[in-house]
Amino acid sequence: MLANYAFIGVFFIGAIIFPIIPLAAAYFLGPKRPTPIKLDTYECGLEAIGDIRVQFKIQYYLYALAFVIFDIEVVFLYPWAVAYGQLGLFAFIAMAIFLIILIGGLVYEWKKGALEWV
């Protein structure tokens, strides 16, 4: 039984070690002589003029958050729709409750005006 999960353990360890090796190599083998010119912001061959950071409106974040929420909904909805014939009534009720909660959240956002672009 434990041998069945050995592959998952090896994969998990590899997934942790694989990104650490290049990061450690870059840290230990890379040059460590920062100068003001090296630390300066550089983009497209032009020197940056003014403040580099641009503050975005909160509406961008609200739309992005709503997109992520409904994208995750699709991730849950697709496998359920594919296996709908074998799942039965309990899975239908569970997904209906899930969709009602998400639609309730969308209606709440709409009523609060979070989806209005001003």
Swiss-Prot record:
Its EC number is 7.1.1.-. It catalyses: a quinone + NADH + 5 H(+)(in) = a quinol + NAD(+) + 4 H(+)(out). This is NADH-quinone oxidoreductase subunit A. GO terms for molecular function: NADH dehydrogenase (ubiquinone) activity; NADH:ubiquinone reductase (non-electrogenic) activity; quinone binding. PANTHER family: NADH-UBIQUINONE OXIDOREDUCTASE CHAIN 3. It comes from Roseiflexus sp. (strain RS-1). Belongs to the complex I subunit 3 family. The lineage of its organism: Bacteria, Bacillati, Chloroflexota, Chloroflexia, Chloroflexales. Pfam families: Oxidored_q4 (PF00507). It is found in: Cell membrane. NDH-1 is composed of 14 different subunits. Subunits NuoA, H, J, K, L, M, N constitute the membrane sector of the complex. InterPro entries: NAD(P)H_OxRDtase_bac/plastid (IPR023043), NADH_UbQ/plastoQ_OxRdtase_su3 (IPR000440), NDAH_ubi_oxred_su3_sf (IPR038430). It comes from the Bacteria. The chain crosses the membrane at residues 6-26, 62-82, 87-107. Gene3D superfamilies: NADH:ubiquinone/plastoquinone oxidoreductase, chain 3. The keyword Membrane applies. The gene is nuoA. It is a multi-pass membrane protein. NDH-1 shuttles electrons from NADH, via FMN and iron-sulfur (Fe-S) centers, to quinones in the respiratory chain. The immediate electron acceptor for the enzyme in this species is believed to be ubiquinone. Couples the redox reaction to proton translocation (for every two electrons transferred, four hydrogen ions are translocated across the cytoplasmic membrane), and thus conserves the redox energy in a proton gradient. Keywords: Cell membrane, Membrane, NAD, Quinone, Translocase, Transmembrane, Transmembrane helix, Transport, Ubiquinone. It is an enzyme of class 7 (translocase). One of its GO terms (cellular component) is plasma membrane.
